[in-house]
Regions:
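Conserved Rossmann-fold NAD(P)-dependent oxidoreductase catalytic core, especially the SDR/UDP-sugar
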Residues: 1-31
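Active-site loop/turn elements of alpha/beta-hydrolase fold enzymes
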Residues: 8, 59, 101
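Flexible, glycine-rich beta-alpha linker
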Residues: 12-13, 32-33, 55-73
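Active-site Tyr-X1-5-Lys
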Residues: 17, 30-55, 82
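Short-chain dehydrogenase/reductase
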Residues: 30-42, 67, 71-75, 97-98, ...
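Hydrophobic alpha-helix immediately C-terminal to the catalytic Tyr-X-X-X-Lys motif of short-chain
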Residues: 40, 44, 48, 77, ...
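C-terminal substrate-binding subdomain of Rossmann-fold SDR/epimerase-dehydratase oxidoreductases
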Residues: 81-204
């Protein structure tokens, strides 16, 4: 048996440098309640590690048709582009690592097939700015995404190092950001037309 615990790369201590964070990078679990709860999950896993084989997957920003919770950036922009007259973002400069849901699932399956136990980062190993994502939404929706240019909370740049994941599995993402966002955008459009969106889907 193997237990998999999903936490977050937000555990890593923020820094101004553009170097990616590997699994040995120092953590800061006291950023907020969400991050601290993930830290507690990891501590429980460590306590039982000798009796329960486990993997701790520190996830980057996973997006896709079934990841529709606000205030996550991509689902929020898509929802607003369908239902609002104006679309805006807090600031277009921050860069984060975004991974499509199907790619994340493939990576998880690939890792299960190994004998590895311990911590591993889950992401694409590359960053994309909020501005670049806004441009994709503009092309799909025909609506301009306004930059409010407000002060950014948190680091401007956050990337996880996925070298360990690749070394263990050889896994690489199949979907580009454009492809993943387009698939998500179209699926949410179908749900909207079928009266399943936004209330029944976005709040689930």
């Amino acid at each position: 048996d193997l237990f998999i615990c999903f936490t977050t790369i937000l555990l890593y201590k923020a820094r101004d440098s553009m170097l990616p964070c590997n699994e040995s990078h120092p953590i800061n679990p006291y950023v907020n309640d969400y991050v601290f709860s993930k830290h507690l999950s990891e501590e429980v896993i460590r306590f039982y590690k000798d009796s329960v084989p486990s993997i701790i997957m520190r996830c980057s920003n996973i997006y896709g048709p079934t990841r529709l919770v606000r205030p996550d950036l991509i689902p929020t922009l898509i929802q607003d582009s369908y239902s609002c007259d104006s679309v805006s973002v807090w600031n277009k400069k921050p860069q984060r690592d975004f991974i499509y849901l199907e790619d994340a699932a493939d990576a998880i399956v690939s890792l299960i097939d190994t004998d590895y136990t311990g911590i591993v980062n889950l992401g694409t190993g590359a960053t994309t700015s909020v501005g670049e994502i806004s441009n994709i939404i503009e092309k799909l929706s025909g609506k301009k995404v306004v930059d409010l240019e407000k002060k950014v909370k948190g680091p401007m740049y956050f990337q996880c190092d996925t070298t360990l994941l690749y070394d263990l599995t050889g896994w690489k993402p199949k979907y580009t950001l454009d492809q993943g966002i387009e698939k998500t955008y179209k699926r949410m459009g179908v749900w909207k037309n079928e009266n399943l969106w936004p209330n029944k889907v976005m709040t689930s």
